[in-house]
């Protein structure tokens, strides 16, 4: 049987793991980031964005597959709301949650009420067969596409998974809902075997994902610092420290030893999800960290010779002009080496999505027209704040950056895209609420 796994535009690590599981079971499996018609017996789409549910290329590939009598299954983070996936894309089934165990049975048996962790339509009714079993942390090698070395995700060819789950419960984030709040870690030996395989396949730069890197091997919410250091040391031994990043980290998950290890075994950057300078908004976001903890964490990173980047979310429902000003003030104060700005996106299955569904449109900054300084640009309030914050952050980086016309237009294009994508996602959410 021939199986094609497609992960649109970026081959995600999760898609490669599913490909590896199927290949190990003896199926003739291939993987690609190109969305195209296929002559495989089974098409598996690994989808990680709500935008994929509206993507005409994906709809066409599924239609083609079904018309020629092949089967099509969808999995990945979009499965948080299987009714949306079935309604928008009409695959034969959706793999809900972690798919490593479920996909094998689905491929072998086809959709059936006996397989836990799937959703499918039968005689006009949606059947959901409970939750998927958590996947074991030992697994076959991922199926690596031959062009992996050309892929670029925030500077890395691939983000590998060292553990699943996050002790945080941020209201906008899917990680604790998809993988749970208990951390399940892989063995260092397995991770290093995989890193060698990626290197052999042409990967130059690896990044560690998993919500918060330093939670690797943690138990009952307590960090296992020696294991994290050993992990970084091991991967750097294969790739070289200049080719490893361990970016995402919670401000309350650092120690001096963790920071020294990041400095010694990686490219030397830490990436904090700071989100807001307003305590009120951080509480609304369920961030579980305070602005003072952010200040302290940034200071400590600098003392350990690390560069610090921060991500911020604007346009969260309930964010007032004063809240937004506090975020601007914090950026000015911290003078971060890099800043990433996003408009709050209601990802299905998250508390933020529930919040967005519960408020009238006129209270959602994504729908409110901006009437201030950028009115002539025709932005929503959320887009205007994102645009303004990008410009503001450039002014307050340690290395002063002049915003020229090109950057101005890039930022404008970026916020318009974010705004329109989020409007489209919100419309889908509303349709299936
Ligand atoms: S700390 Fe990061 S991974 Fe964990 S819930 Fe918050 S945003 Fe998600």
PLM regions: where:
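Glycine-rich beta-alpha loop elements in corrinoid/cobalamin-binding modules
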Residues: 7, 18, 30-131, 343, ...
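Flexible glycine/acidic-rich beta-alpha junction loops that bind and position SAM and/or redox cofactors
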Residues: 82, 168-171, 205-220, 280, ...
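Conserved SAM/AdoMet-binding glycine-rich loop
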Residues: 2-5, 196-308, 314-316
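C-terminal accessory regions of radical SAM enzymes
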Residues: 5, 9-10, 19, 325, ...
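Conserved, mostly hydrophobic/aromatic
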Residues: 118, 166, 170, 191, ...
């Amino acid at each position: 049987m021939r199986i094609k796994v497609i992960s649109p535009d970026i081959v995600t690590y999760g898609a490669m793991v599913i490909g590896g599981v199927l290949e190990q079971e003896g199926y003739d499996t291939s993987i690609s980031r190109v969305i195209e018609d296929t002559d495989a017996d089974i098409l598996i789409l690994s989808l990680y964005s709500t935008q994929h549910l509206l993507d005409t290329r994906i709809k066409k590939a599924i239609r083609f597959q079904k018309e020629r009598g092949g089967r099509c299954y969808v999995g990945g983070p979009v499965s948080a709301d299987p009714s949306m996936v079935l309604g928008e894309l009409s695959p034969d089934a959706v793999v809900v949650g972690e798919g490593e165990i479920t996909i094998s049975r689905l491929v072998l048996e086809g959709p059936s009420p006996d397989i836990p962790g799937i959703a499918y339509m039968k005689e006009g009714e949606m059947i959901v067969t409970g939750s998927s079993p958590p996947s074991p942390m030992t697994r076959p090698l991922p199926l690596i596409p031959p062009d992996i070395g050309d892929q670029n995700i925030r500077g890395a060819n691939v983000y590998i998974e060292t553990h699943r789950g996050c002790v945080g419960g941020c209201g906008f984030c899917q990680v604790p809902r998809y993988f749970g709040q208990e951390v399940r870690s892989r063995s260092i030996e397995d991770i290093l075997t995989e890193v060698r395989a990626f290197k052999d396949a042409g990967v130059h730069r690896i990044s560690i994902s998993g919500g918060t890197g330093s939670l690797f091997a943690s138990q009952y919410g307590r960090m296992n610092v020696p294991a994290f250091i050993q992990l970084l040391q091991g991967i750097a031994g294969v790739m070289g420290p200049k080719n490893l990043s361990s970016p995402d980290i919670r401000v309350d998950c650092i120690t001096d030893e963790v920071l020294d290890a990041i400095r010694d075994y990686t490219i030397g950057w830490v990436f904090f999800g700071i989100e807001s300078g307003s305590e009120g908004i951080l509480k609304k976001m369920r961030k579980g960290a305070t602005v003072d903890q952010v200040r302290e964490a940034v200071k400590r990173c600098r003392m350990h010779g690390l560069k610090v980047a921060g991500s911020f979310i604007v346009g969260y429902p309930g964010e007032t002009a004063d809240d937004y000003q506090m975020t601007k003030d914090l950026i000015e104060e911290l003078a971060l080496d890099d800043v990433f700005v996003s408009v709050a996106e209601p990802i299905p299955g998250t508390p933020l999505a529930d919040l967005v569904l519960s408020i009238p449109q006129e209270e959602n900054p994504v729908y409110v027209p901006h009437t201030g300084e950028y009115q002539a640009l025709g932005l929503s309030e959320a887009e205007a704040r994102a645009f303004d914050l990008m410009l503001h952050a450039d002014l307050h980086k340690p290395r002063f950056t002049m915003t020229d016309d090109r950057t101005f237009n890039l930022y404008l294009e970026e916020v318009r895209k974010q705004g329109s994508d989020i409007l489209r996602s919100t419309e889908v959410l509303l349709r299936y609420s």
